[in-house]
């Protein structure tokens, strides 16, 4: 899986075959990475030395050019982030690297023991020092500062300590030139694979609870905890990738493979935890309303990048800029239309709608307007009392800036930017007016958009 966070890697993959790459490309990337390392803050001598070793291997083993090119691409995109001092960027840099390793070698064990593994290990050292400790603490504290949760708070201190101790221990052990069996036993005792699972499991529980909540504040908390969960899973994988390389260095192949397998299983578990986000059922529409539109939220955009890495299927087909027919699921012969009523313009369900008649336009912030295209220009807006009024204003305001929440059965639910938890539905009356209902209105509020 190639993430949009890896712009260099996109370019490299387009010009590199599965086994071989252009020497001019790899030389260009070597120069860029070397320059970035020299300009970066902190001590990067080990990384520069490992880079020289990689240069030598490329010269003597042409078949490694393609793999080296891909890894240099992922490292190049990560370097600025790892040295940024910003926790979110640092974790994004970790994601670049672990994704590059997974894509190129299938995991750290696939790199073998050589210049590429030494180079990657030296780059990971930029993270597995104080950056790991500070990044974990920063993202946990950021999430908990927004949402009070005593149970999560109790486990947070232990999680921060586990990450800090493990990363510091790995960093020290990497300085050993020859690892003995005794050293490997000490590593196993001090960095157990399961050590980070408790807090991550607590977050999984909160995400599960928040998925079906009817509280808007709880739904917002769940989405923030989803981002924290993704960040911690990636940082855990980064530490364990470094640990697997360390075991390979000590010729403990079976242990390195076991660590890598644990990472693989946890990646699958993360995909299972997050899968519902792109396969929502109506009872999960509220968390979907916080998550969508994805382009309107930095949190949602970050989560989407992580879901791609974990292998979660893509979001269902997005709504575009064109006319659509909105057909009700409960009354499946009725679609949205408009009428004039006592000087007001109302939207209702009509049985004679044959062609797409609602123009949907995406706004710059990711939300949409819904405009009747059959008569004079009318925007659907949610009135304070829930009615679906038509307004002649060019900009209907956040009452008429809509979000579309895709459901797993192909239908959509619709709510406004101002009231994300009030969903558009067709009422049970002779007129079939379009109104809004708090939380899931049932099939009367599920729409086929064609």
UniProtKB/Swiss-Prot annotation:
Which terms under GO biological process does the entry name? killing of cells of another organism; monoatomic ion transport
- Signal peptide extent: 1-18
UniProt superkingdom:
Eukaryota
Q: How is it modified after translation?
A: Contains disulfide bonds.
Q: Where in the cell is it found?
A: Secreted; Nematocyst; Target cell membrane
**Keyword list, A-Z:** Cytolysis, Disulfide bond, Hemolysis, Ion transport, Membrane, Nematocyst, Secreted, Signal, Target cell membrane, Target membrane, Toxin, Transmembrane, Transport
**Tissue expression remark:** It is suggested that CrTX-B is synthesized in the tentacle, is modified (become CrTX-A) and then migrates to the nematocyst.
Q: Which GO terms describe its cellular component?
A: extracellular region; membrane; nematocyst; other organism cell membrane
Is Protease found in the keyword set?
Answer: no
Q: Which GO terms describe its molecular function?
A: toxin activity
Q: What is its main location?
A: secreted
Per UniProt, subunit arrangement is: Oligomer.
Q: What else is known?
A: CrTX-A and CrTX-B are encoded by the same gene. However, they differ by their molecular masses (43 and 46 kDa, respectively). In addition, CrTX-A is primarily localized in nematocysts, whereas CrTX-B is only detected in the tentacle without nematocyst.
As for family, the record states: Belongs to the jellyfish toxin family. Type II subfamily.
Function, please? Has potent hemolytic activity. Is lethal to mice and crayfish. Causes cutaneous inflammation in humans. May act as a pore-forming toxin, disrupting normal transmembrane ion concentration gradients in susceptible cells.
Full protein name = Toxin CrTX-A
Protein species of origin: Carybdea rastonii
């Amino acid at each position: 899986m190639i993430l949009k966070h890896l712009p260099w890697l996109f370019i490299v993959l387009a010009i590199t075959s599965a086994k071989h790459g252009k020497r001019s490309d790899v030389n260009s990337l070597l120069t860029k990475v070397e320059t970035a390392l020299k300009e970066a803050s902190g001590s990067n001598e080990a990384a520069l030395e490992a880079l020289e070793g990689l240069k030598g291997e490329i010269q003597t083993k042409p078949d490694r050019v393609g793999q080296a090119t891909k890894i240099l691409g992922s490292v190049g995109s990560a370097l600025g982030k790892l040295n940024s001092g910003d926790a979110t960027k640092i974790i994004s840099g970790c994601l670049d690297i672990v994704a590059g390793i997974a894509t190129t070698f299938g995991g750290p064990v696939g790199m073998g023991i050589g210049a590429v593994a030494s180079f990657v290990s030296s780059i990971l050292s930029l993270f597995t020092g104080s950056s790991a400790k500070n990044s974990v603490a920063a993202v946990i504290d950021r999430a908990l500062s927004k949402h009070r949760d005593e149970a999560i708070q109790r486990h947070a201190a232990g999680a921060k300590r586990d990450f800090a101790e493990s990363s510091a221990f790995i960093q020290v052990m990497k300085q050993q030139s020859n690892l003995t069996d005794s050293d490997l036993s000490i590593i196993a005792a001090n960095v157990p694979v399961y050590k980070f699972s408790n807090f991550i499991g607590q977050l999984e529980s909160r995400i599960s609870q928040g998925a079906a909540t009817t509280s808007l504040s709880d739904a917002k908390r769940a989405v923030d905890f989803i981002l924290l969960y993704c960040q911690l899973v990636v940082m855990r994988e980064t530490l364990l990738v470094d640990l697997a390389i360390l075991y390979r260095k000590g010729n403990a192949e079976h242990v390195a493979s076991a660590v890598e397998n644990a990472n693989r299983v946890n990646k699958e578990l993360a995909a299972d935890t997050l899968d519902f986000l792109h396969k929502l059922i109506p009872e999960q529409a509220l968390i979907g309303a916080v998550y969508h539109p994805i382009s309107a939220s930095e949190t949602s955009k970050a989560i989407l990048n992580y879901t791609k890495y974990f292998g979660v299927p893509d979001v269902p087909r997005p709504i575009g800029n064109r006319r659509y027919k909105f057909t009700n699921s409960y009354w499946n012969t009725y679609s949205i239309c408009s009428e004039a009523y006592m000087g007001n313009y109302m939207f209702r369900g009509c049985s004679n709608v044959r062609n797409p008649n609602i123009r949907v336009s995406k706004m710059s912030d990711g939300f949409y307007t819904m405009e009747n295209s059959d008569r004079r220009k009318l925007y659907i807006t949610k009135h304070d009392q829930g009615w679906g009024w038509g307004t002649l204003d060019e900009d209907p305001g956040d009452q008429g800036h809509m979000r579309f929440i895709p459901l797993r059965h192909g239908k959509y639910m619709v709510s406004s930017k101002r009231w994300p938890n009030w969903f558009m539905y067709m009422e049970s009356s002779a007129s079939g007016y379009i109104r809004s209902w708090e939380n899931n209105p049932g099939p009367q509020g599920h729409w086929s958009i064609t």
